[in-house]
């Protein structure tokens, strides 16, 4: 069983997950939709290589964020509202599945953070996850921007 879970983790960590010809899930806050790289605006999810500590064990929290997004999207194609481009020329957007914000879902689930440097929109959702020790808030972690060094 542990071997199968390890294989699944490696699969999710190393491949862009594609459910349709026009959707690939890159990580917890980035998708490619119709060939366009979209970074979810206002949030920051852990990097794929990022780990957290829970009960003295390393947890692949970056992979967990991606898996959570994969499960949430399911076989749906997100609808995204563009907010412009970032310095890396990615489209910044808020994306929805069944009229639910994927950004809000990830932050309330504790696997993304309100990216206060750029937006205040998801602060209450982050406070909800933090106060209820949901997701990464139940672990010891580094914020993604600290992990990346920026």
Regions found by a protein language model. Give the residues of each.
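Small beta-barrel nucleic-acid-binding modules, primarily SNase/OB-fold domains
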Residues: 2-6, 11-150
């Amino acid at each position: 069983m542990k071997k199968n879970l390890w294989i699944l983790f490696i699969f999710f960590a190393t491949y862009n997950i594609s459910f349709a010809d026009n959707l690939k899930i890159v990580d917890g806050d980035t998708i490619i939709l119709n060939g366009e790289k979209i970074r979810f605006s206002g949030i920051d999810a852990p990097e794929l290589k990022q780990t957290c500590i829970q009960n003295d064990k390393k947890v692949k929290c970056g992979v967990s964020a991606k898996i959570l997004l994969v499960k949430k999207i399911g076989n749906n194609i997100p609808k995204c509202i563009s907010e412009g481009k970032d310095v890396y020329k990615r489209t910044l957007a808020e994306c929805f599945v069944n009229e639910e914000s994927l950004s809000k879902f990830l932050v309330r689930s504790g696997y993304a953070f309100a990216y206060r440097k750029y937006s205040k929109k998801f602060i209450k959702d982050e406070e909800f996850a933090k106060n209820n020790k949901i997701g990464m808030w139940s672990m010891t972690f580094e914020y993604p921007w600290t992990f990346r060094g920026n």
